Amino acid sequence: MANALASATCERCKGGFAPAEKIVNSNGELYHEQCFVCAQCFQQFPEGLFYEFEGRKYCEHDFQMLFAPCCHQCGEFIIGRVIKAMNNSWHPECFRCDLCQEVLADIGFVKNAGRHLCRPCHNREKARGLGKYICQKCHAIIDEQPLIFKNDPYHPDHFNCANCGKELTADARELKGELYCLPCHDKMGVPICGACRRPIEGRVVNAMGKQWHVEHFVCAKCEKPFLGHRHYERKGLAYCETHYNQLFGDVCFHCNRVIEGDVVSALNKAWCVNCFACSTCNTKLTLKNKFVEFDMKPVCKKCYEKFPLELKKRLKKLAETLGRK
């Protein structure tokens, strides 16, 4: 061994080694301690850690600066496994679906409008563009009529009737968390909607002596569902508050709401008691107070007296003209 070291030379400086000198052995290559340094910065390796590239050794910092790619997502250097995709480099944990953030490194991805998406998200985006549903079981596009179960779309043939076991179609019905073919469902005494005449599987609205799907109990004028809000009945039809009063009731000129209770009729308009006030100072008025009309709104006597003389003359003349008609 002594003879071998006597003839050995440093891999870097090609010099020999003193008998008691500390020698660094790296994969069979021998170095003086001061010669075992980074090929770029010529500093010793922190804690002996180095990276080798094309026969040269580098400290971690210089190896990253010279050779390690930067992650397109986080901007950090990538040491270890590199994902090459979309003309960029990524850490495996940084390469994620642009929509759901699922890690794509081991499951693959699909390019979609410049985005990298997992296959389920790609299918959903494709279906949205085609105006179609995505099956929530197999994640494929549903080309035919979907079966809606617990508010999610499915291929009907993924399910069987809970009663007779028959493979289901899009006409299947949900009842208490179970799916039934239409014949079995209709035998169970399910309420029928007064609008569409089809069975009601979920919430039932009881109104006007009938039962309705929530979305089918609507205003006869605007056809918007009431969704639990108050409705008004007239000759067998239901109306929302706004259209009932537009058609049959009084709407306050000031707040544009239905007048509940007493109505103040003034200036050829209807007002809520609390809304009938001076349009200048907001003092509450009654029909017993003196007021004048200005810009189709009431003005109290005190505010009227503050008007310019010329304006008061014109208002008085206008009132006299209207009074003669």
Curated annotation (Swiss-Prot):
UniProt key word Signal: no
Protein species of origin: Homo sapiens (Human)
Subunit note: Component of the heterotrimeric IPP (ILK-PINCH-PARVIN) complex composed of ILK, LIMS1/PINCH and PARVA; the complex binds to F-actin via the C-terminal tail of LIMS1 and the N-terminal region of PARVA, promoting F-actin filament bundling. Formation of the IPP complex is dependent on protein kinase C and precedes integrin-mediated cell adhesion and spreading. Competes with LIMS2 for interaction with ILK. Interacts (via LIM zinc-binding 5) with TGFB1I1. Interacts with SH3/SH2 adapter NCK2, thereby linking the complex to cell surface receptors.
Chief subcellular location: other
Stated role: Within the IPP (ILK-PINCH-PARVIN) complex, binds to F-actin, promoting F-actin bundling, a process required to generate force for actin cytoskeleton reorganization and subsequent dynamic cell adhesion events such as cell spreading and migration.
Variant or mutagenesis effect after changing D62A: Alters interaction with ILK
Domain LIM zinc-binding stretches: 10-62, 71-121, 135-184, 193-243, 252-303
GO molecular function, one term: actin binding
Result for mutant: F42A: Loss of interaction with ILK and loss of localization to focal adhesions
Residues annotated with N-acetylalanine modification: A2
Protein known as: LIM and senescent cell antigen-like-containing domain protein 1
Gene that specifies this protein: LIMS1
Membrane topology: Peripheral membrane protein
